[in-house]
Amino acid sequence: MWTLALWAFSFLCKFSLAVLPTKPENISCVFYFDRNLTCTWRPEKETNDTSYIVTLTYSYGKSNYSDNATEASYSFPRSCAMPPDICSVEVQAQNGDGKVKSDITYWHLISIAKTEPPIILSVNPICNRMFQIQWKPREKTRGFPLVCMLRFRTVNSSHWTEVNFENCKQVCNLTGLQAFTEYVLALRFRFNDSRYWSKWSKEETRVTMEEVPHVLDLWRILEPADMNGDRKVRLLWKKARGAPVLEKTFGYHIQYFAENSTNLTEINNITTQQYELLLMSQAHSVSVTSFNSLGKSQEAILRIPDVHEKTFQYIKSMKAYIAEPLLVVNWQSSIPAVDTWIVEWLPEAAMSKFPALSWESVSQVTNWTIEQDKLKPFTCYNISVYPVLGHRVGEPYSIQAYAKEGTPLKGPETRVENIGLRTATITWKEIPKSARNGFINNYTVFYQAEGGKELSKTVNSHALQCDLESLTRRTSYTVWVMASTRAGGTNGVRINFKTLSISVFEIVLLTSLVGGGLLLLSIKTVTFGLRKPNRLTPLCCPDVPNPAESSLATWLGDGFKKSNMKETGNSGDTEDVVLKPCPVPADLIDKLVVNFENFLEVVLTEEAGKGQASILGGEANEYVTSPSRPDGPPGKSFKEPSVLTEVASEDSHSTCSRMADEAYSELARQPSSSCQSPGLSPPREDQAQNPYLKNSVTTREFLVHENIPEHSKGEV
């Protein structure tokens, strides 16, 4: 019992672990004519050891052929595959775990037949623009109908043109070629019912026969007319687009005449492809022909308009764009009758049209293409299209284009204007065209606050300024501008600016408020002064004390007031008043000193007492001894200090003068022996002065009389 269970378990495990081979699928067969029938299938490679048994049934099912194969491919011998038989193929895959058969596939041998490349026997030019090709297959086709394909190209071209020949014989005629042009040819073929072409034959190179030159493409460059209306016309010509590359030309003939004249001018045997004419102001007709050994070409005619003639405009719009690897120009014509166009292009930086100008004639289309490699990269070209109706040339339509764009060589030069509290205007200059390397699509303004996030704003290519808003007050910003083309952008130099802390409006507002307040205060003050003048007048115009009513006037008596009033009436130029020395007695000096000291004591005492009524001193001419001037020792004469009189004001000067005169008169009456009085010490200079006398006398000068006795001088 247990033995049977173990046997069943091992059998089930072995069955569950068995891996059958993959079923062969996608069987494909090719009948290599006169060689074998080769079939392949999938999978191409197994993970374990797998072998195949291939079975072929042929002769319309009458015969079988089987064989072993170790790979997913097998070639049946030629004896088993003879067209137009129909065969069937079956593949069985087997390994140690089992067998798997494929589905049976059926094959019509002629439909899967493939031949070897044909052999080109000869290529002969016939007439002017035709080749006759003779060829043969490598196998014996046994009369099965064939289809041929011939491909050809010119030597300097990489574009092949293919031509099919149904019910192809072993001779093919290739027509529609260009005269005197070198071509490269190749041939292949297949059975009419087959799906497989043979490989291309070996390439053959031949040249078509020569013929007379083709008509030329003719163009002109018109120079400005001089004062007489004469102008230079440069004629340009070249082979027409599509003309034979190997076309031989010996020379050119030029003919031209004025439209209002029958006088024909001819210029023969020109070997260059340009010529300069000097024509008068009227319209002319110009023709150019080329010639070789077989004859001359047709005339290329062009009309040169009158100097004052207005040309017509037949182009409504035009655009240029890049379609790798070409530059394409399209335009729209307003008149369908125009079918010929002249396209001009030259670099914008060219100093003159010739020789930098390139041109080309276009017919039957309204577009023009040129390979990008034939134009300079990063260079702006002026492209103009001229409509040609008959022999008349119309008004051109011009645009600019780049064959290849790059990033600008440098960024814009940037400035900051109109800086406000939260706004600023960024301006920049256009980049020179020589540094653009393409069309500027837009400008991007980048700005960043100090320690803040970088922000940007984009404007179109026509804008040269940008207003920044929502900035922060009193903040430093860094700003730069990037100019972008189709290829990328280039940043300009970074600059810094700082927003304002206070705006002009705020300054005006603050000034207006302060000014308005001051104006209101002034108005209120004036109004108050007009209403109550007694209160305002003492504040604005305080009373000035009258020196005549001071304590000095009280001390000197009524004589001072009268004298003061008298001197006031006789006012004069105080600057001319000078105290002059005069003959005086010998003791006059001492009396003057004593009298003046008494005067100073009285004034100082009144100032200190603030209104005391007691007045020191006696009469004006009394000789007293000043407390501040003690008597000197006997036997010594009076020392002579100098007194400087300064004229400061009319009243103070006249007062002091009168005092001196009165003192002098009093002393003159006394005996001359008074000069022998004991000397007095000089007055103290540091004593405070009366404020009413500070402008009249600032220093004192003592005058010594010339008649002082000799013994007094000796004592001094």
UniProtKB/Swiss-Prot annotation:
Instruction: Spell out where the chain crosses the membrane.
Output: 500-520
Question: What post-translational events are described?
Answer: N-glycosylated.
- Residue span, Fibronectin type-III domain: 23-115, 117-211, 213-304, 305-403, 408-502
Annotated Polar residues bias: 670-679
Asked if the Swiss-Prot or TrEMBL record annotates the protein with the keyword ATP-binding, the reply is no
Listed Gene3D superfamilies: Immunoglobulins (2.60.40.10)
Region: Disordered, residue numbers: 622-641, 648-696
The protein's induction, as recorded, is: Up-regulated in the diseased tissues of a mouse models of allergic asthma and airway hypersensitivity. Up-regulated by IL31 in dorsal root ganglia. Up-regulated by Th2 cytokines IL4 and IL13 in macrophages.
Compartments, record wording: Cell membrane; Presynaptic cell membrane; Cell projection, Axon
Membrane topology term reads:
Single-pass type I membrane protein
Q: What happens when the gene is disrupted?
A: Mice do not develop dermatitis upon Il31 overexpression. Decreased levels of immature myeloid progenitor cells in bone marrow and spleen but normal numbers of circulating blood cells.
Please state the span of the N-terminal signal peptide per the UniProt entry. Answer: 1-18
Q: Which residues lie on this side of the membrane: Extracellular?
A: 19-499
Q: Name one Pfam family in it.
A: fn3
User: Hey, what tissues is this thing expressed in?
Assistant: Expressed in a subset of dorsal root ganglia neurons. Expressed in spinal cord and trigeminal ganglion (at protein level). Expressed in skin, testis, bone marrow and thymus.
Is Cell membrane tagged as a keyword?
A: yes
**Positions glycosylated per UniProt:** 36, 48, 64, 382
Its recorded name reads Interleukin-31 receptor subunit alpha
